[in-house]
Regions:
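Short, acidic Ser/Thr/Gly-rich low-complexity loop/linker segments typical of extracellular
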Residues: 52-67
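N-terminal periplasmic accessory domains that precede
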Residues: 102-106, 116, 120, 146-151, ...
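Outer-membrane beta-barrel signature, preferentially recognizing the C-terminal barrel domain
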Residues: 514, 524-573, 580, 598-609, ...
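Face-selective signature of the C-terminal outer-membrane beta-barrel domain
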Residues: 303-331, 353-493, 499-502, 509, ...
Length: 772
């Protein structure tokens, strides 16, 4: 797609979606939320407007000085409901509202949980960069945990995989989960009780402090000061040996909370299949064709994660959190067996087995303090150690001899320390954030392959950032800047790189139900430990790979134009995206004497153009809702000696039905396709059906993944001229029936604890899961 066509597409969609229809009602309700004791503004309180029959009409949050407002109201009776954590909820009856009214609401401080606000109809507040979703009574009663509740909301741009309990973004960016503003894991979200959740704040524009994250999902939960909860969240297969289970317990006493979470996942099958077809063209010779026909293989996996947490909260001004975590991932078998043909002639068999084990203890300390004049500071320090062990055994053999064999082993020890601090200041119509972050890591690797080779790498990354957010009337904008330094050093390299990384957002509220937003961001991607490991590994007789110590960090530029419009039961939104990488790290394949070497290099450029539309309908009669998404991708990959492009259309669909205590879920998710370097990767492609029964503190259900046909697989196609290949991986685990059970027991009064506003973790262990 050339530049003129791209600009034309942007303009057509921009003018097609602009809608300036706004109603002209003159009545309004506005005012301030104030602390009854201090008379100071209460920031970010939740305000909902109901009819007297409890039907939800509108909702908003107070700004940084406690202001709120509702416009375009007809003459009627209303109920104004105000709630904020740390205060008692208050409801005000507005009888016979026939003209605009100014209402100041005074809230009393309280250590008790908030009174329930029953929402019985549509309850989403759409802002330029955020959706605030108040869960309805129906959604709460049909959800067993925080993850299921999110699935009932069908938020645009989010893909929820109920099998893996993972959340991904349709634009490929990272999704950050939070509880009361703190980064959380999917397992922690699973432990949330629906009755705790007051609202979900979904931001599809993430500020510069969140790095490369594209979406933020923040659960706002209630707090008490005593009691506890214990519970389980189980999902296990009925036809294969596989499952994922969560066990949790929390105990609250005074200003302290103690929490213990244990998560385990496991899978064991003997139908791990891989089919690979490739050719090798050396010089001007006739290509050698090799076909590997899959013949099963063992796959086994275990994951154990134990987390002990303690936090202390003094009112809303001081919060301390300490977390001790130990994670073990054990992958003893990822084996493939194949029958081998060369130029159509059977030559033997292949065994390709990979094992991997990772141990990671972590300590995480966090401190937050609120200051006078709408100021707040945060500090976070994380220390971790990761020991990773990887082994590979590759053999080609016939009935009499071993034709080719290669053994490889790697032991990696990584020590890392992450420290971050943020200062925040609120103003009348905006806020300012200043922050600094430093990452220090040291890695030692020992490689066993025809001898023992040792290497080490020191890596540091330091950055400072500033961000200004402003909103007034119908216009909002955000300006941010990050200055970044990355340094690599070992016995053979000593390099530093500096980058200036801006981020901007401009949005305009076209009407009460529609808005348009544009944002642009420049970010940096660093080479991974695997890419920097300068050791050659033979994959088969004709193929090898190695890292590259001369790799440099590269920059990304993201542009996004977004439009949304709501009317009744219908919500429509559209995205135009462009993602550009300058000198990205992509693969190169070079001919050696008798084999080809795969090696990462900084290439010329990479582009992705994307157009996507989503239509959500519901709830219809408080029973049915569904959403449809369709889109188009175009990729262009420019290497130093190659040029490739790839295009694809895609779609997805979700349906949800709720009746009495029963819930039905249906999902269709097609292949996620991507061209990067010379390789097209297609992964995913599943459909899911489930039925669930919900009762107080208890639910069970039956679900089926790919019940009609096993369509899930991973397809990788390489387009290199001299050594192209096509690989397809699949197993019986992609077609399974699962049983789910959720149970929890509460005693006293429980609360979602005070929470952190920043969280850091180092997950680059310098190992790979497969090698061919």
């Amino acid at each position: 797609m050339d530049l003129n066509k791209k600009h034309l597409l942007y303009l057509i969609v921009f003018f097609l979606f602009i809608n300036l229809n706004a109603s002209g009602q003159s009545n309004s309700v506005s005012g301030k939320i104030l602390n009854q004791s201090t008379k100071e503004p209460v920031r970010y309180a939740s305000i909902a407007l109901f009819k007297q029959d409890s039907v939800f009409l509108k909702g908003t949050t107070a700004d940084s000085i406690g202001r709120f407002g509702f416009t375009n109201l007809i003459s009627d009776d209303y109920v104004l409901s105000v709630s904020c954590m740390g205060f008692e909820a208050k409801k005000i009856l507005l009888q016979n509202l026939s003209e605009s009214a100014e209402v100041d609401v005074f809230l009393s401080e309280s250590v008790l949980s908030l009174g329930e606000i029953v929402v019985s109809a549509s309850s989403t507040i759409s802002k330029i960069n955020q959706r605030i979703v108040f869960p309805t009574k129906l959604q709460l009663s049909h959800s067993a945990n925080g993850m299921q509740l999110l699935n009932t909301m069908m938020l645009p741009g989010l893909n929820i995989n109920p099998m893996a309990n993972t959340i991904s973004s349709s634009d490929g960016g990272k999704v950050v989960l939070q509880i009361n503003g703190v980064n959380a894991t999917p397992e922690e979200v699973q432990t949330l009780q629906p009755r705790q959740i007051r609202r979900v704040e979904y931001s599809d524009y993430a500020g510069i402090r969140y790095g490369e994250a594209s979406k933020i999902v923040n659960y706002i939960v209630t707090r008490d000061n005593r009691g506890g909860v214990i519970g389980v969240d189980l999902m296990n297969s009925l036809n294969i040996l596989a499952g994922g289970d969560v066990f949790f317990a929390k105990f609250n006493k005074g200003k302290s909370e103690y929490a213990l979470n244990y998560t385990t996942a496991f899978q064991k099958i003997n139908s791990n299949n891989r089919t690979r077809t490739g050719s090798y063209r050396f010089g001007n010779s006739t290509p050698l064709h090799r076909d590997e026909i899959g013949d099963g293989g063992d796959y086994s996996y275990q994951m154990h994660d134990v987390t002990f947490g303690y936090n202390y909260q003094q009112s809303d001004s001081v919060f301390f959190n300490a977390k001790l975590k130990y994670a073990l991932t054990n992958h003893p078998h990822n084996d493939f067996k194949s029958n081998l043909k060369e130029n159509g002639i059977e030559t033997g068999r292949i065994f390709d087995g990979v094992s991997q084990k990772i141990n990671t203890p972590t300590i995480d300390l966090y401190y937050e303090r609120g200051l006078k004049n709408q100021q707040k500071v945060y500090a976070n320090v994380v220390g971790s150690f990761a020991k990773a062990e990887t082994g590979r055994n590759y053999i080609e053999y016939d009935n009499a001899d071993t034709l080719f064999s290669e053994q490889f082993g790697l032991v990696s020890d990584k020590y890392s320390l992450i420290a971050e601090g943020i200062y925040e200041k609120g103003f009348t119509d905006g806020s300012l954030k200043l922050g600094a972050k430093h990452i220090q890591s040291f890695t030692e690797q020992e490689i066993h392959q025809n001898g023992v080779f040792k290497s080490d790498l020191n890596q540091t990354e330091s950055s400072v950032f500033a961000e200004w957010n402003h909103g007034k009337d119908n216009f909002s904008y955000s300006l941010g800047i990050r200055i970044n330094r990355v340094h690599f050093s070992n016995s053979s390299v000593n390099k530093s790189y500096y980058n200036f990384l801006p981020k901007v957002m401009f949005g305009y509220q076209l009407s009460e139900k529609s808005f348009i937003r544009y944002d642009a961001e420049m970010s940096q991607t660093n080479p991974t430990l695997v890419e920097l490991t300068d050791t050659e590994i033979r994959l088969d007789p004709y193929l090898a790979e190695k890292g590259n110590l001369s790799l440099k960090p590269y920059r990304n530029l993201n542009n996004n134009l977004f439009y949304e419009n709501k009317k009744g039961l219908f919500t429509f939104n559209a995205n135009l995206r462009h993602h550009y990488k300058h000198n990205p790290i992509m693969e190169s394949i070079k001919e050696q004497s008798d084999f080809f070497l795969i090696m990462p290099e900084n290439m010329k450029s990479w582009n992705r153009y994307n157009a996507e539309m989503t239509l959500k309908v519901g709830m219809i009669k408080n029973i049915l809702q569904f959403s449809l998404t369709g889109g188009y991708n175009h990729f262009n990959s420019q290497g130093n000696n190659y040029s490739h492009s790839h295009s694809n259309f895609y779609y997805s669909a979700n349906v949800l039905a709720m009746y009495k205590k029963w819930m039905f879920i249906g999902q269709i998710q097609p292949f996620d396709e991507k061209l990067y370097g010379e390789t097209v990767t297609k992964s995913g492609n599943y459909h899911y059906l489930a039925i669930q029964y919900n009762a107080n503190n208890f639910s069970f259900g039956i679900g089926a993944f790919n019940p009609f046909k096993n369509v899930s697989r991973t397809v990788i196609e390489n387009k290199n001229y001299q050594a192209p290949f096509r690989r397809e991986s699949f197993s019986s685990a992609s077609q399974t029936i699962v049983a789910t059970l959720t149970w929890n027991f509460s005693f006293g009064k429980t609360h979602g604890s005070g929470t952190k506003s920043i969280e850091n973790q180092d997950t680059d262990y310098g190992v790979k899961g497969s090698y061919k």
